[in-house]
């Protein structure tokens, strides 16, 4: 009875806070879009399915990471009341076909989850990203899915005390296409906006992702050119940001045209610009360990990695891809994989006051690993050696086995999507990303 009362009270408080926050946020930031009232869809049915599937996985990940029961309830309520409500139609047939195919994951599931071990922290932070999808996205009434993101973003205010949308508003104008930009004939994806949440004890930090391909096509420019112009027009783009951007763009453009890494995604933290980051994501088709080090240091322009850091990165590389950890492995490319998301993904972070970018690499284990079982065992061993695990000393492998409830880890590849690594002060930080595979595997 006390638990039920507490849950009801939490929902009442959440609803009240959300109503106030939406009105305040929408007024303060003058959102240009309004949501249409749709009929003919049993929305509550689809919301319930999203919550029972991904909401339950989110709680499992939080519990395994050591979050309190109150924290789990707080973030589960937000997911159900705000995020699940923003994911559109839940897939009920397999293979799933939808009018809107999200670029978030390879099977188009519009949510990706992660555990993040920062530096020497023993247990991870839980994070997730979502692409809000309107009920009629991809149809004539909402061809570019322009209606869902605004409401979801506004609803974050009660749990995001540091929310600041100045940079969001700036880049929304520069990087997102709308119907007025004309025809959008492309064989690539139509996704343009993702929202991400880093979960603290009783709050969260919001991040926003822009995929500017449609806007670039409309403007007749490359993604990199569009990102560059939008950053340089930013009022807070100080000399350090400009210098950092110049280092990055010069390095990328120095590649031969057919080998040039391609800019794909741009992201900001929705916090005070003085504390925010500008993140440019680029994909390279080169897949050797040596090429990874080359990209991470921008050809040696950023501070050199220490020998210990390089050894740690090589150990992680071999663990993720089931390769022998010896010197010869560094020059051998991973097996050939012709896929839209093949190759290695990097992000380069620009900050006010920082004259050089910092980097992170995303290892696409879903393409180059053997099975999810092999990947989980490899990363589990790597983390264990560094004193990193889940709550109560539970191994990463056992944690992944528990959250992947719809199939055996040995029976497929793709539940773990990326293993990322970044080096800060000589210490390697690792994140593991998961695709719930909702659009690929039946839960029935």
UniProtKB/Swiss-Prot annotation:
Task: Spell out the CDD domains in the cross-references.
Answer: PT-DMATS_CymD
Cite the EC number: 2.5.1.122
- Which keywords, in A-to-Z order, does the entry hold? Transferase
Q: Which top-level group of life is the source organism from?
A: Eukaryota
The reply to whether Transferase figures as a keyword in the UniProt entry is yes
Q: What class of enzyme is it?
A: transferase
Upregulating conditions: Expression is positively regulated by the thioclapurine cluster-specific transcription factor tcpZ.
Alphabetical list of Pfam families matching this protein: Trp_DMAT
Q: Which InterPro entries match?
A: Aro_prenylTrfase (IPR033964), Aro_prenylTrfase_DMATS (IPR017795), DMATS-type_fun (IPR012148)
Q: Reaction catalysed by this chain?
A: L-tyrosine + dimethylallyl diphosphate = 4-O-dimethylallyl-L-tyrosine + diphosphate
* Gene Ontology biological process terms in this record: alkaloid metabolic process
Q: Name one GO molecular function term.
A: transferase activity, transferring alkyl or aryl (other than methyl) groups
Report the transmembrane regions from the record.
Answer: none
Tell me the subunit arrangement.
Homodimer.
Give a short account of what the protein does: 4-O-dimethylallyl-L-tyrosine synthase; part of the gene cluster that mediates the biosynthesis of an unusual class of epipolythiodioxopiperazines (ETPs) lacking the reactive thiol group important for toxicity. Firstly, L-tyrosine is prenylated by tcpD, before undergoing condensation with L-glycine in a reaction catalyzed by the NRPS tcpP leading to the diketopiperazine (DKP) backbone. Afterwards the alpha-carbon of tyrosine is oxidized by the cytochrome P450 tcpC to form a hydroxyl group.
* Similarity-based family: Belongs to the tryptophan dimethylallyltransferase family.
Q: What is this protein's name?
A: 4-O-dimethylallyl-L-tyrosine synthase
Origin organism is: Claviceps purpurea (strain 20.1)
Lineage summary: Eukaryota, Fungi, Dikarya, Ascomycota, Pezizomycotina
């Amino acid at each position: 009875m006390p638990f039920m009362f507490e849950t009801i009270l939490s929902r009442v408080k959440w609803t009240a806070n959300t109503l106030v926050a939406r009105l305040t946020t929408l007024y303060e930031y003058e959102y240009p879009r309004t949501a249409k009232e749709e009929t003919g869809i049993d929305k509550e049915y689809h919301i319930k399915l999203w919550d029972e599937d991904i909401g339950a996985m989110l709680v499992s990940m939080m519990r395994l990471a050591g979050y309190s029961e109150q924290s789990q309830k707080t973030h589960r309520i937000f997911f159900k009341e705000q995020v699940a409500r923003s994911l559109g139609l839940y897939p009920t047939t397999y293979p799933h076909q939808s009018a809107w195919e999200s670029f978030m994951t390879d099977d188009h599931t519009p949510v990706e989850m992660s555990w993040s071990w920062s530096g020497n922290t023993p247990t991870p932070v839980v994070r997730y990203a979502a692409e809000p999808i309107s009920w009629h996205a991809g149809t004539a009434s909402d061809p570019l899915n322009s209606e869902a993101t605004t409401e979801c973003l506004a609803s974050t205010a009660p749990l995001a005390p540091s929310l600041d949308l100045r940079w969001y508003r700036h880049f929304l104008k520069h990087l997102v296409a709308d119907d007025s930009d004309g025809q959008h004939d492309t064989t690539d994806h139509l996704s343009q906006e993702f929202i991400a949440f880093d979960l603290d004890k009783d709050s969260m930090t919001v991040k926003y992702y822009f995929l500017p391909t449609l806007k670039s096509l409309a403007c007749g420019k490359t993604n990199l050119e569009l990102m560059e112009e939008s950053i340089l027009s930013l009022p807070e783009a100080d000399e350090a940001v400009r210098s950092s951007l110049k280092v990055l763009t010069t390095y990328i453009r120095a590649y031969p045209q057919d080998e040039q890494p391609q800019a794909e995604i741009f992201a900001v933290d929705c916090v005070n610009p003085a504390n925010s980051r500008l993140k440019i994501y680029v994909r390279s088709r080169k897949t050797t360990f040596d090429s990874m080090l080359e990209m991470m240091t921008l050809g040696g322009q950023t501070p050199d990695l220490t020998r210990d850091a390089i050894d740690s990165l090589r150990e992680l590389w071999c663990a993720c891809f089931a390769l022998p950890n010896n010197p010869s492995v560094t020059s051998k490319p991973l097996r050939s994989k012709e896929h839209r998301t093949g190759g290695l993904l990097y992000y380069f972070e620009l900050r006010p006051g920082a004259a050089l970018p910092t980097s992170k690499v995303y290892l696409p284990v879903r393409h180059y690993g053997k099975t999810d079982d092999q990947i989980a065992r490899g990363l589990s061993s790597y983390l264990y050696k560094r004193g990193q695990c889940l709550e109560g000393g539970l191994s990463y492998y056992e944690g992944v086995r528990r959250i992947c409830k719809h199939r055996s880890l040995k029976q497929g590849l793709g539940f773990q999507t990326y293993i990322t690594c970044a080096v800060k002060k000589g210490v390697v930080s690792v994140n593991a990303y998961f695709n719930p595979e909702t659009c690929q595997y039946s839960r029935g």
